[in-house]
Amino acid sequence: MTTNDMERSKIVESSDTIEAIEECYRMGWSDGLPVVPPVDYKVREMLEMAGLTGEEEIISLEMRNRVLTSENVAANAVMAGCLPEYFPVLTTTLKTLEEEKNFVHMASASTSSPAIMMLLNGPIRDEIGANY
């Protein structure tokens, strides 16, 4: 883990919600879009919904020399406003991308315009209320 990675994964504590949001911006955890501060209890709620501990490796991004753990993914999901009941779908989606490493690398390294498209189908679609 580089110094930059260590800095980006630090835990921030604040009793002021607005200050916590501003710290997310200062840490580079957002590109300017609104965020929900990834407070511990919200991250744990995500992990519990998927039956995860926070230590599991969800996906390895070799082109960026990064490994995303379930805790990393949960914190980002909280910041994006993801509901806990969606989190198992999110982790499954990322694990699917792990199986298609070559395509993920090609899509992220291309100077063209490839895109990754995923479809959600089956009973889970109705269970979480996804549009179709």
PLM segments and residue spans:
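Alpha/propeptide regions of enzymes that mature by internal proteolysis
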Residues: 1-112, 116, 130-132
